[in-house]
């Protein structure tokens, strides 16, 4: 990892973390007492490398995920002090060290100094989600069980795609999620497409 030369926040150096995870065995992203979460595992590994933190290293993520949800291209940022960075010593390869400490369900791809003004949550221009459904129950692939919803009845992707277009634009999606104090349920859905490929919808 190169020496940090960019974004400073309150005297701390901000880093961008790019990573992916299989959320099957986790109760979501956000750390929760007594529960296995993605953030909890990442914080534990970072604490081993950088030492104790009172504010979770200022960690913020582009978008939280719920229990069992996966992320292919997740982004977070953390803020580290000079003292914490000094603990890297002669082995500054943070990516390799974090991956060595964590379950293979979480893989860090990059850990690098953030660009000036970068904020993992507010710098995100959009977020993309993919849902996979199989209506060919007899041919379901056991290797894909964690990533595909398997149904026992046939679906009509053409009709589904037509209906899905009604969700486009600025709408209140409160009925799709749990209510959180201070959180908005209004989202601007830019694009949605339902199609059948070789195996799934």
What is each residue range found by the language model?
Residues 2-201:
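Structured-RNA-binding interfaces characteristic of tRNA pseudouridine synthases
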